[in-house]
């Protein structure tokens, strides 16, 4: 498919700073997925990963963020985002042909690594493919990974709890860690248990069926674009709805955090639930 807007050098340099949800967020997504996958999917993943522990997905959830900084993994830097050329907060929207750069993006990466797992689950590329899928589905659910403005907010300086950082970083790391109460693997497990309970019997239980609407293992691009479009809407409705002047002049650890917490927690929950559904579909296909 055509790629009309290759990633500029400046944008790529800033994008290299991104870490998806940060370690805590990615591990939380993975633990949530572990709570919902079928037992056969658990065995499928554990076999590929060579890990039968109770953290088999969480243990690899952040691998892609480390790998992209190696010589071997530098090619994968664009796979963590799609640069929506929209106009927040006035209008938001993601278009695959317009926004997926010539070097690829999160959406094309999901297509590629899903197909590897479908076609060669016992092949030499399956290990990294699974690790990429676990990570990138998490990335897609962070709104600023579906946004071009200032390299997904990396170029927007903000103050959070008295410290200078950038908008992308507080969505990746500061706010989820504050909500969870830390950033260790054990904290991620506890946070995942909280969000999993909301999915099963709590706040999200009436919504969860709609979270997998449109899912189609035969069309990874359309499926992951549904998820990217969903997350991107929050760039207009929550992330930047008050405008840049407010973002630049206000400590965002107060009212901004309060309005954002329900959004990022539900997105993390969606990511884990959808990851489980996607892995179930992969594992159930005849290879």
Curated annotation (Swiss-Prot):
Gene3D superfamilies (alphabetical): P1 Nuclease (1.10.575.10)
GO molecular function, one term: nuclease activity
Binding site for a divalent metal cation 3: 21, 26, 139
EC number(s) recorded for this UniProt protein: 3.1.30.1
Residues annotated as binding a divalent metal cation 1: 65, 80, 135, 139
Keyword Transferase: no
Disulfide cysteine pairs (residue numbers): 92-236, 100-105
InterPro entries: Peptidase_S8_Asp-AS, PLipase_C/P1_nuclease_dom_sf, S1/P1nuclease
Residues engaged in binding a divalent metal cation 2: 145, 168, 172
Region (Substrate binding): 135-183
Reaction(s) catalysed by this chain's protein: Endonucleolytic cleavage to 5'-phosphomononucleotide and 5'-phosphooligonucleotide end-products
Activity modulation notes: Inhibited by inorganic phosphate (Pi).
Family according to the record: Belongs to the nuclease type I family.
Subunit: Monomer.
Protein name: Nuclease S1
Species per Swiss-Prot/TrEMBL record: Aspergillus oryzae (strain ATCC 42149 / RIB 40)
Gene name per UniProt: nucS
